[in-house]
């Protein structure tokens, strides 16, 4: 299937460029972002946009643009946008973990840190809709190298190091950025938190490197045990955020629902869960609607690409083991599970099924 999946991933990346960037120029979203940036305004505020962060002008301009874009998400001016962003943030954890685990086979700890810092920053800066598809298209779906007798460099880490690094370097900055301003923190401080969160892939990569250095000389963990904790944590985050999105969205349509309010139309499943098709594009009149449309396509394409690639990994592994797969039956089951628990949750489960089997082979070979 790899010869089919790789071109599809490239096509998906092209669709992401078209829907996220080209159409954003056409519908006025980019112009709206530029106008707010030049005026120094934020969604819901007439002014207060911070201009200085690091002292490096190109980086400060990028972080300033990030604050204009992410402010309505963290400020909560649109409950539907914030709710959808939470689901998207939860799905990023399994997507990042898939990239990390696939790098850890034969790489040294320095290579693991550098590769994941670079690829993570590209995903954060350009967007997972484009970069996840490109990065996965560049990676082999074969699991043969996971059954080698060498011990991965990251096996020196403790089983809770990866989940802890995700909490400290990804979830905690998200939580700090979500604090209400000016009720709990000042507007400039909130913008600083939002800007700081942009570097979470670098923080996680450095945390993994530091944890490896602190544990140098310790007894190595079983790779399967190391990744199992991270897998369970990432799966829980993804499922909880996706199920929460579904529950609130579908409950909003019932007359006696606690979520029935002025925002019920925005929370309706058709508005919140389904991206507007390209030929249904309308002029963007508010920053919140433009950001939600942007996230719709980013999440839909990146999660589809991750699911497709992990399906190929699972397929290749079963075929290599001379197994048999009922294609249509499995595909329908995966589609149903993706709707219920999230496509990234299903993608991670498929990847872990293939990975854990090959890590067990690795362990059995080394014990001989």
Swiss-Prot record:
GO molecular function, one term: isomerase activity
GO terms for cellular component: membrane
Enzyme Commission code: 5.4.99.-
Location(s) in or outside the cell: Membrane
Enzyme class: isomerase
KW Transmembrane helix (keyword) present: yes
Lipid bilayer topology: Multi-pass membrane protein
Record keyword Transmembrane present: yes
Pathway in which the depicted protein is active: Secondary metabolite biosynthesis
Parts of the chain that traverse the membrane: 10-30, 81-101, 118-138, 192-212, 233-253, 334-354
Record keywords: Isomerase, Membrane, Transmembrane, Transmembrane helix
Family indicated by similarity: Belongs to the membrane-bound ascI terpene cyclase family.
Chain's role: Part of the gene cluster that mediates the biosynthesis of the indole diterpenes penitrems. The geranylgeranyl diphosphate (GGPP) synthase penG catalyzes the first step in penitrem biosynthesis via conversion of farnesyl pyrophosphate and isopentyl pyrophosphate into geranylgeranyl pyrophosphate (GGPP). Condensation of indole-3-glycerol phosphate with GGPP by the prenyl transferase penC then forms 3-geranylgeranylindole (3-GGI). Epoxidation by the FAD-dependent monooxygenase penM leads to a epoxidized-GGI that is substrate of the terpene cyclase penB for cyclization to yield paspaline.
Descriptive protein name: Terpene cyclase penA
Taxonomy of the source species: Eukaryota, Fungi, Dikarya, Ascomycota, Pezizomycotina
